[in-house]
Amino acid sequence: MKERKPKYGWYVKKLIVGFSIVGLLGLSLTIFGFYFEDWMELLLIISGITLMILFLWPGLGMGIMNINLSNKSLSRKETKLSYVIKSPKILDVGCGTGRHAIQIAKTLKNGGHLYGIDIYSKVAIGGNALDTVQRNAHLEGVDNKTTFQYGSAIDIPFDNEMFDIVYFSSVLHELHMEGGPDKALDEAYRILKPGGYLKIAEWNRSSWQTIVYCGIFCLVFKKYQYWSNLIKKHGFRIEKQRKINGMHRFSAIKPKI
């Protein structure tokens, strides 16, 4: 019997396919341009190169990004709090298919429980679904210390001061409704215990990795200072911040009263 393996899917798979198709059309226009003369040649070549820069670049780049991410595990530094806090309650907001949530759950050696919520959009992640993440947790042997359910980042379905750690990994920039990130951080503050930790990772629009992966679409991401100011605005104290692998990473604390 064939061994079943977890399926984590690709981030923005549909975008990658769409961009790549349009980009390949641009490549075709560029090649055909050399078979014409004068203004038609120039028009086809310029149009083709433009389409390749705008679409083929990020299409291929985000494909490479997914391959790189599939081969990476969270470092001990990124999951340190799971070891330090005794029996922590952890929430991963926007858990998707569980790529990071399940890695965190594997670090829970001394009790504790990881919860994950998502709206399970297949636009964000290919194959994204509640039954997918639950199946992945079972196959990875952590279904006894994980709970996954539907839930929105701007209306988190848990009680006040319930969690020791809350994660937002590449989620806040996806909240396109007015005041979305503000509402999400208000919710994070509400559900965190005093002294609890907020962990945020967001793509850094200025990093060479993000530019290589996303091309001109790197501009959809915010600058470092935006996230820093937003975190402080909502009452958190930033403990650590760093830029690594194309991302801003923040570790902040909800002050004890």
Please name every model-derived segment.
Residues L91, R99-I154:
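Class I SAM-dependent methyltransferase SAM/SAH-binding core
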Residues I85, I154-V166:
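A short acidic, Gly/Pro-enriched loop at the edge of an enzyme's catalytic core
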